[in-house]
Amino acid sequence: DPNIMTSIVKTSFEIAESGRPGPVLIDVPKEIQEGELDSFDDSLISTPGYNPTLKGNIKQVRKARDLIRESKKPIILAGAGVILANASQELKELSYLINAPVMTSLLGKGAIDETDDMALGMLGMHGRKVANDSINESDLIIAVGIRFSDRATGRLDSFAPNSKIIHIDIDPAEIGKNVDVDLPIVGDAKNVLSSLNNVLKDYESNEDAKKWVKLLIERKKECFPRVTYDDIPLKPKS
């Protein structure tokens, strides 16, 4: 029925903008393409096969809490999913709550204020040394809304060799696709981080984690003057 096309197009936009945003293919049979509209109906179509999980499983969230309690060197990796979910505040709250510095993927830049003490900058092949070094030394990675692309990980067989990985993502197909994870949590970044902060509200970071974040902040201070150095202006040479 050609008359259903208006509803299909509207529904495709709803799907494209929900869950993990992305393109939607509309496959239109030839007889529909050649048909004529008798009416205009823009009501949404029921799509029972598409139902993104927004709220993370509370049992998985509690397991994440337990892994965090055991960690001495936690870090947070933030991707574009944090920005799309408007979860920057929840991300920052978790970072300070558990003494875990934050680094971002290229698409995750802006998930945390780059001038924040907890921000280590971007990781990966175009990232900062302090960020990449901390990946290798950490014992727990909390990855939020990130795909673990090769631009961020480099060689997979040498990525985060000492870390357990918690992966939070609204798209279950992304979890475990590139990097093996110890704890998957499917859900909207804002909702899951809010739940995690809630179960950790009485958490007191251990001394090892406090020393860890202090060490990384000091490393960042040592590296940054090299890119902000302005004591002696550069002079062009012939």
What are the residue ranges of the model-derived segments?
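Conserved acidic residues
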Residues: 72, 139, 182
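Cofactor-pocket helix-loop regions in the catalytic cores of large enzyme subunits
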Residues: 3-4, 27-117, 210-238
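Short gly/pro/ser/thr-enriched loop/turn and capping motifs at secondary-structure boundaries
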Residues: 33, 108-113, 149-150, 172-176, ...
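Structural signature of the thiamine diphosphate
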Residues: 1-43, 67, 132-164, 199, ...
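Glycine-rich, anion-gripping cofactor-binding loops and their flanking helix/strand elements
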Residues: 80-166
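Phosphate/pyrophosphate-binding active-site segments
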Residues: 162-238
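Hydrophobic/aromatic beta-strand patches that form the interior of the parallel beta-sheet core
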Residues: 24-26, 103, 142, 166-168, ...
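Short beta-strand elements at the ligand-binding edges of bilobed clamshell
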Residues: 51-55, 115-127, 178-191
